Amino acid sequence: MAAALTFRRLLALPRAARGFGVRVSLSGEKITHTGQVSDGKDYRGIRFVDRQKEVNENFAIDLIAQQPVNEVDRRIIACDGGGGALGHPKVYINLDKETKTGTCAYCGLQFKQQHH
């Protein structure tokens, strides 16, 4: 529950203040979504001589934050990540409380029960 509240507070901040997106290290190299930045003396950096390292700037946390909360009319919802081979194992999310927003542990989609 604390993680959901923290995530909700984070979404309330302006996009520039969230701290998501591509960051740059002190050497000017782009930092990946996992926070990896290579040392200047690392031998694996030879792959990037005369060209820049390509980092996907569409971090998953940014894309999930743009998704609206799905309002459902049931008390228990099943999330399978879209189904098929591209989804994830089916999980059931309990939406009993009136103020509760359920978040899928696999894909991060949020659900809220629409009370009549």
Curated annotation (Swiss-Prot):
Main subcellular localisation: mitochondrion
GO biological process: mitochondrial electron transport, NADH to ubiquinone
Membrane disposition: Peripheral membrane protein
Domain of life: Eukaryota
Transit peptide interval: 1-20
Function recorded in the entry: Accessory subunit of the mitochondrial membrane respiratory chain NADH dehydrogenase (Complex I), that is believed not to be involved in catalysis. Complex I functions in the transfer of electrons from NADH to the respiratory chain. The immediate electron acceptor for the enzyme is believed to be ubiquinone.
Protein name in the entry: NADH dehydrogenase [ubiquinone] iron-sulfur protein 6, mitochondrial
